[in-house]
Amino acid sequence: MRRVKGTLFVDYVRMLRSRKDVDWSRHLRHEDLAFLGERVQDDAWYPMGTFERMGLAILAEISSDMQVVQAWGRAQIDWLCVVHENLVAPGDPCETLMRFRVLRSSFFDFSALAVPTLNDGEASVLVEYGMSPPAEEAASWQTLGFFERLLEVAGARKVSARFVSTSWTGDLVTEIELRWQT
């Protein structure tokens, strides 16, 4: 069973809890709903299947606009920088991405993300969450926003992020191209 760390899982739970007007049982399994009543532990592991279903529920009930999903990914950085104080190397985007490489296994217990290419001013990120196409698309947009903001917090300027390939449209893998100036 693939799992996600509580530091990421908590964002989905918070979003669902914030909408008391929605009947989440229409989208989630009984075992998923139990997490809405529990305290999410930052360092605990949670089922990726539940994470995927929660993400799809958010898309269905809150927003299916990928620009909103991208903005949510950007917003995650501020919280993760509090939890992982050494994630950002101020003034050094490359070192920050190197630190992410080290930390990435602490977010998922499988190879969801890879940074195979990293040079000054450019990098590529491979995304493979192994979810259904709609969930994979949303998670990839969230990831794109995450890396945009991570680079900005590290001091990068003129950050550009774009998809080179997308698994949800039939490509073998999703690849994000990152470019920036320092």
Q: What are the residue ranges of the model-derived segments?
A:
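Amphipathic interaction/junction segments at domain boundaries or subunit interfaces
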Residues: 39-142, 165
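Short terminal or interdomain "cap/linker" segment that borders an active site or interface and mediates
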Residues: 1-13, 17, 105-144, 152-182
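N-terminal leader/assembly segments
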Residues: 1-63
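Short alpha-helical "patches" and their helix-cap loops
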Residues: 22-34, 98-102, 158-167
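Short, mixed-charge aromatic SLiMs
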Residues: 31-39, 79-80, 166-176
